[in-house]
């Protein structure tokens, strides 16, 4: 990247992306986010849903929550069928205490795929935060029924 001058052009774009990923691996999320921004500008905004997911990961680690929410919303807009984006959007909403919004996102995911086990687990977490323990345990049970491997500890802790 040092060989290129700013403003960066498409020629520098792959190197910016590589540096952003290296910075994420080195726990330099804020700098990675800046590289993702530089990449976005270098390619004149011609990016796909995966770009928004990767930049959201950097924003989340950098505690730039609104940025993370915006990037996940854009990823969903570009690829509404990828339910992992909806789960990620729900996770960010949970992080910032927007439990009702997280539930709405997860319900939309379940409309697309009623057997999406992770959505039920995340719904249960949101419901716990909202003091809806009975609903949370029902959501955890559904996640377990659908094969979510990460729900057992939650059931053990909150539903016994």
Segments from the language model and where they lie:
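Hydrophobic/aromatic packing residues within the alpha-helices of TPR/SEL1-like helical repeat arrays
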Residues: 1-4, 36, 72, 106, ...
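TPR alpha-solenoid repeat register
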Residues: 15, 51, 85, 119, ...
């Amino acid at each position: 990247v040092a060989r290129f001058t700013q403003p960066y052009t498409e020629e520098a774009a792959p190197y910016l992306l590589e540096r952003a990923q290296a910075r994420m691996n080195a726990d330099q999320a804020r700098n990675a986010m800046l590289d993702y921004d530089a990449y976005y500008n270098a390619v004149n905004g011609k990016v796909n849903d995966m770009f928004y997911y990767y930049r959201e990961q950097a924003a989340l680690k950098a505690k730039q929550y609104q940025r993370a929410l915006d990037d996940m919303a854009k990823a969903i807009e570009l690829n509404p069928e990828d339910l992992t984006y909806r789960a990620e959007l729900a996770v960010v909403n949970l992080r910032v205490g927007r439990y009702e919004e997280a539930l709405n996102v997860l319900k939309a995911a379940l409309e697309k795929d009623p057997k999406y086990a992770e959505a039920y687990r995340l719904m249960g977490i949101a419901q716990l935060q909202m003091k809806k323990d009975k609903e949370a345990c029902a959501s955890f049970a559904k996640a377990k029924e659908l094969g979510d491997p990460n729900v057992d500890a939650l059931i053990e802790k909150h539903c016994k």
